[in-house]
From Swiss-Prot:
A Pfam entry, by short name: YjcZ_2
Keywords: Membrane, Transmembrane, Transmembrane helix
Transmembrane segments: 17-37
Keyword Membrane attached: yes
Name listed for the protein in its UniProt record: Uncharacterized membrane protein YoyG
Organism (species): Bacillus subtilis (strain 168)
Entry membrane topology: Single-pass membrane protein
Source organism phylogeny: Bacteria, Bacillati, Bacillota, Bacilli, Bacillales
InterPro entries in UniProt: YjcZ-like
Location within or outside the cell: Membrane
Protein family according to the UniProt entry: Belongs to the SscA family.
GO cellular component: membrane
């Protein structure tokens, strides 16, 4: 997508893990808010 041939997908320390952590953090906040409310 961005011109990287294998850097974005071949390595786990790229942006994919960062996006995954952000998504999990947002889901955790949503679930926590749902249980609190």
């Amino acid at each position: 997508m961005y011109g990287y041939s294998g850097y974005g997908y071949g390595f786990g320390c790229g942006t994919n893990t960062f996006v995954l952590i952000v998504v999990l953090f947002i889901l955790l906040i949503i679930v926590g808010a749902a249980f609190i409310c």
